[in-house]
């Protein structure tokens, strides 16, 4: 290739390079905008599903993490969770901590099925609901306080008059 052809080639390349870069950037921005719109639509769909589930009063939460009062946070392995259906609760949660007054022969953690004595549901802020439940079991009252966020994430605080407080986090089961 002669020097003259090489110079013409580089001039052509330098003239086309900004257009190629602009085309790539425009494609990337269009893809990003499309992805952003798709993500917003998915978030809206999940928020709508969460609203319907909370309004129905029947929900299942799968727990991923536990934060005991006297220990470090732990990732939960296994099928831990809580199911609320009508006026009953099915709790399958571990308990780590101090028990102040225990029944003899019953070492089940927070694993039980029972009736809900009280229920209160409210929209706390624009991005989450508070669902508070009271369960009266044998010698203790358990207070389950769920914060159910529009993105399907859930935090749960379990308080008792006979045990340390436990905090859990997990995901709302959306079918």
Annotate each PLM feature.
Residues 2-19:
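Bacterial N-terminal signal peptides that target proteins for export
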Residues 115-175:
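Helix-rich interaction surfaces within compact, conserved domain-sized segments
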Residues 82-128:
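Mature extracytoplasmic domains of secretory-pathway proteins
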Residues 25-28:
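C-terminal motif of bacterial Sec signal peptides marking the signal peptidase cleavage site
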Residues 30-33:
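Bacterial signal peptide processing site
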């Amino acid at each position: 290739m002669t020097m003259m052809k090489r110079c013409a080639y580089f001039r052509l390349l330098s003239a086309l390079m900004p257009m190629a870069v602009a085309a790539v950037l425009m494609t990337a921005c269009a893809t990003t905008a499309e992805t952003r719109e798709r993500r917003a639509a998915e978030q809206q769909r999940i928020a709508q599903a969460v609203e319907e589930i909370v309004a129905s009063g029947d929900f299942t939460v799968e727990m991923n993490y536990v934060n005991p009062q006297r220990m470090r946070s732990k990732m939960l392995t296994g099928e831990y969770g809580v199911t609320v259906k009508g006026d009953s609760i099915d709790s399958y949660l571990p308990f780590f901590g101090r028990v102040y007054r225990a029944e003899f022969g019953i070492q089940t953690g927070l694993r039980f099925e029972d009736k809900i004595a009280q229920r209160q549901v409210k929209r706390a802020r624009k991005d989450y609901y508070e669902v508070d439940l009271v369960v009266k079991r044998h010698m203790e009252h358990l207070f389950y306080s769920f914060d159910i966020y529009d993105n399907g994430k859930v935090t749960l605080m379990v308080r008792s008059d006979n045990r340390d407080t436990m905090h859990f986090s997990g995901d709302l089961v959306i079918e």
